């Protein structure tokens, strides 16, 4: 026999990941819409509420959950600060609402006055209970209604106001609560960030190793292009032992800089530095601090690469050999992915008997850079490290730094990528690079944005990386670079680009592999930062449109549209009255003509009236009416970004808005 019980049952609370085992994700300013099935035997009325608090606060915030249909109730709350929010559903039998419903039927059924008076007395008794728990103002109103009931005023018993007062203050009869669920709230940049990756050693106009002070001189250009996160590959000393040469050659020449991912090497004074040191040729930690300060002054966040692996020259190798794998002969095992061998790095053994000290030290790597102004990180291959480590590490870090944003670089199996997101990674690389047809992109978009994955997995679309130059970019050249950039920047609300080779349309692959020739991972390159033929103006315009249109700053409203052409993809996004439709050609060689089919009613557009279609990308204005609209895209113009709104509002309103934005 149970010690306590309730007639009320709460089930199917959503959103909840794996029954509430993992938090859902939101960004600051977003809504959490909660639904629950709430049942009671018989015909009693229910009161259902959503109870929410930030984990750092004791105060709970309560909102009603109205009945929707079929015993389902719905409510919502907005998250306004980074960190953890806790929410639960509670419900109880609303005895006054039950009484009021029955009383209304008695009145409408014409029951005799004596019965009505008797029922009013019962209703007054319920209000008495509510008045005992009400503050003074509400108690006075309840007392006035009690007097009206006692005087036989049936009309006073039927109002919504008295029902709400009773619901708010009456004892919660047979109350029960759901389990408590968690929302992790990210800073806004986790939802809207535009990442720009570059190698700081390659910013000079000659082939000499640059400093971070010289790299900082490039930051205004990146800011002018509309990016808000500057991502640097590892900036640490690079090992000399088994250093890789150009294009991953097994041996390096005396002047080859090596791969930044071979972390751990010699500092200017001859000592060894690792994950908490800056390469001496970059200028040391002082230069890094100046770089961060310059970035922050420009409104840019700095993201650092965290790669938990060590070159043979890393101080950990001498100080903690127990943290690494050993061969039978006692030597340290280097990294391998047969048949590939990476002799310039040693993988870390997370299962070492000394794992508590190892884990604490690796967590302190993040803490060191947080102390130097960095709260955004990209983690290299997190899927090759234990899930338990990431769950512990990320949660510990966020106790003191809730604004932390961590991007998972895990090109691996979908379930593994999703699990890393559940563990606490804010963003993740995706398969976007390999989705190159409208059908493939639409199917992938539906999976990411319209399934349960959208509650916790935030995709970050990258058209290229230092490791990946897809054949589509090679074959499609400049048109493909433009179309893939528009797709990345508008289909997802957060995206990134490995900047210099992308904006300069570098299409030279190494040995016909999906990799850049003369890869910057292994050598210093020079770029013409002022090249008038680069994609810089195009990229800047797309980023400006992202910043000006709230619809492009989220993914939940995306809807794929029919174009009646196999090489055209179209989708809409909406936020309030900001309605955007993007159309992109995936044929970089030919002109494509199609018909954009708009679901007028679903998009909130007038069925029988004209509306404005402003192509923001090319500043062209059209007046449309109806559902079908002619499209023609070409290699020179492979994309449209339309803003749709009632005719007569676009040109004047947004000309004024644009003047304000760019003043």
UniProtKB/Swiss-Prot annotation:
E.C. number? 2.4.99.16
The enzyme's first-digit EC class, named in words, is transferase
Q: Which residues form the signal peptide?
A: none
- Gene that this polypeptide is encoded by: glgE
Protein name, per record: Alpha-1,4-glucan:maltose-1-phosphate maltosyltransferase
Which is an annotated GO molecular function term of this record? hydrolase activity, hydrolyzing O-glycosyl compounds
Q: Which residues form the active site?
A: 380, 409
Chain segments carrying region Disordered: 238-266
One protein family per Pfam: GlgE_dom_N_S
User: What are the recorded Gene Ontology BP terms?
Assistant: alpha-glucan biosynthetic process
Q: Where does alpha-maltose 1-phosphate bind?
A: 244, 309, 344, 381, 521-522
Q: Which organism is it from?
A: Salinibacter ruber (strain DSM 13855 / M31)
Reactions performed catalytically: alpha-maltose 1-phosphate + [(1->4)-alpha-D-glucosyl](n) = [(1->4)-alpha-D-glucosyl](n+2) + phosphate
What this protein is reported to do is described as: Maltosyltransferase that uses maltose 1-phosphate (M1P) as the sugar donor to elongate linear or branched alpha-(1->4)-glucans. Is involved in a branched alpha-glucan biosynthetic pathway from trehalose, together with TreS, Mak and GlgB.
């Amino acid at each position: 026999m149970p010690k306590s019980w309730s007639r009320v049952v709460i089930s199917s609370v959503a959103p909840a990941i794996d029954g509430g085992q993992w938090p859902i994700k939101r960004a600051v300013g977003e809504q959490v819409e909660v639904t629950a099935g709430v049942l009671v035997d018989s015909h009693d009325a229910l009161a259902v509420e959503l109870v929410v608090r930030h984990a750092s606060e004791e105060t709970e915030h309560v909102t009603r959950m109205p009945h929707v249909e079929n015993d389902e109730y719905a409510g919502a709350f907005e998250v306004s600060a980074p960190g953890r929010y806790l929410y639960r559903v509670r419900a109880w039998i609303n005895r006054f609402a039950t009484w009021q419903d029955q009383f209304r039927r008695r009145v409408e059924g014409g029951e005799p006055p004596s019965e009505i008076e008797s029922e009013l007395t019962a209703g007054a008794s319920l209000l008495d209970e509510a008045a005992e728990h009400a503050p003074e103002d509400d108690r006075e109103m309840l007392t006035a209604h009690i007097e009206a009931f006692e005087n036989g005023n049936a009309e006073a018993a039927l109002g919504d106001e008295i029902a709400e007062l009773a619901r708010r203050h009456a004892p919660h009869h047979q109350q029960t609560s759901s389990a408590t669920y968690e929302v992790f709230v990210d800073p806004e940049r986790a939802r809207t960030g535009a990442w720009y990756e570059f190698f700081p050693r390659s910013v000079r106009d000659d082939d000499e190793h640059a400093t971070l002070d010289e790299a900082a001189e490039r930051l205004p250009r990146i800011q002018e292009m509309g990016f808000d996160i500057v991502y640097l590959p590892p900036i640490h000393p690079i090992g000399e032992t088994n250093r890789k040469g150009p294009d991953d050659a097994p041996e390096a020449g005396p002047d080859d800089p090596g791969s930044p991912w071979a972390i751990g090497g010699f500092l200017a004074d001859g000592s060894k530095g690792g994950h908490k040191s800056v390469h001496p040729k970059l200028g040391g930690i002082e230069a890094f601090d100046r770089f961060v300060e310059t970035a922050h002054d420009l409104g840019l966040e700095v993201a650092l690469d965290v790669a938990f692996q060590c070159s043979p020259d890393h101080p950990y190798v001498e100080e903690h050999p127990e943290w690494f794998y050993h061969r039978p002969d006692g030597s340290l095992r280097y990294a391998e992915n047969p048949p590939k061998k990476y002799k310039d790095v040693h993988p870390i053994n997370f299962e070492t008997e000394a794992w508590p000290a190892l884990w604490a030290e690796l967590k302190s790597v993040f803490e060191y850079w947080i102390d130097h102004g960095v709260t955004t990180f990209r983690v290299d291959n997190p899927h090759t490290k234990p899930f338990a480590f990431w769950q512990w590490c990320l949660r510990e870090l966020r106790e003191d730094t809730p604004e932390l944003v961590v991007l998972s670089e895990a090109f691996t199996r979908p379930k593994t990528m999703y699990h890393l997101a559940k563990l606490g990674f804010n963003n993740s690389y995706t398969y976007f690079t390999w989705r190159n047809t409208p059908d493939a992109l639409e199917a992938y978009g539906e999976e990411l944005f319209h399934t349960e994955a959208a509650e916790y997995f935030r995709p970050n679309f990258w058209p290229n990386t230092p490791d990946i130059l897809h054949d589509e970019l090679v074959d499609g050249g400049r048109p493909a670079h433009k179309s893939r950039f528009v797709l990345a920047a508008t289909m997802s609300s957060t995206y990134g680009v490995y900047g210099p080779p992308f904006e300069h349309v570098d299409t030279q692959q190494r040995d016909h592999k999906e990799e850049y020739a003369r890869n910057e991972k292994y050598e210093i390159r020079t770029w013409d930062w002022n090249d008038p033929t680069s994609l810089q103006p195009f990229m800047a315009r797309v980023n400006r449109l992202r910043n000006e249109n709230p619809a492009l700053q989220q993914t939940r409203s995306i809807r794929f549209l029919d174009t009646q052409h196999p090489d055209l993809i179209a989708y809409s996004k909406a936020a309030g009255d900001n309605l955007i439709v993007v159309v992109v050609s995936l044929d970089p060689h030919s002109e494509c003509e199609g018909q954009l089919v708009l679901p007028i009613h679903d998009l909130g557009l007038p069925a029988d009236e004209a509306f404005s279609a402003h192509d923001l990308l090319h500043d062209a204005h059209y007046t449309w009416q109806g559902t079908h609209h002619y499209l023609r895209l070409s290699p020179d113009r492979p994309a449209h970004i339309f803003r749709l709104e009632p005719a007569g509002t676009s040109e004047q309103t947004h000309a004024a808005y644009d003047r304000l934005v760019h003043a």
